[in-house]
Curated annotation (Swiss-Prot):
Keywords: Actin-binding, Allergen, Cytoplasm, Cytoskeleton, Disulfide bond, Phosphoprotein
Changes after translation: Phosphorylated by MAP kinases.
A Pfam family hit: Profilin
Record-given protein name: Profilin-3
Organism: Olea europaea
A molecular-function term among this protein's GO annotations: actin monomer binding
Keyword Acetylation tagged: no
Disulfide partners: 13-118
Length: 134
């Protein structure tokens, strides 16, 4: 299966039990900032934004004072899982980033999708990739 198929079929799919509800954008990005696959709606990000995200995984709390920036959008960092998951909120939407051994799985949402649904979608694929040694 191609990386694009993982994004299309496992991240940008209808949320289980909520037909028509799906993430706004999603991507799988290597730890080095290289995009493995992304939805057409995923924002163009700057290298320094990806560096900040990677630093927060290695030094949890790094982004809390300044917020998480992706594609020029600022998200307030909310409770995540140190070294494993970063979650952010902006207005009626937000972001979940799950770290695997080699990649970051991004899910971005807006209402009516809930934070919990975004977490479930992004983290489920991230957990699967971890199980595969990726």
């Amino acid at each position: 299966m191609s990386w694009q198929a993982y994004v299309d079929d496992h991240l940008m799919c209808d949320i289980e039990g909520h037909e028509g509800h799906r993430l706004t954008a999603a991507a799988i990005v290597g730890h080095d900032g290289s995009v493995w696959a992304q939805s057409a709606t995923f924002p163009q990000f700057k290298p320094e934004e990806m560096n900040g995200i990677m630093t927060d995984f290695n030094e949890p709390g790094h982004l809390a004072p300044t917020g998480l920036h992706l594609g020029g959008t600022k998200y307030m960092v909310i409770q995540g899982e140190a070294g494993a998951v970063i979650r952010g909120k902006k207005g009626s939407g937000g972001i979940t980033i799950k770290k695997t051994g080699q990649a970051l799985v991004f899910g971005i949402y807006e209402e009516p999708v809930t934070p919990g649904q975004c977490n479930m979608v992004a983290e489920r694929l991230g957990d699967y990739l971890l199980e595969q040694g990726l």
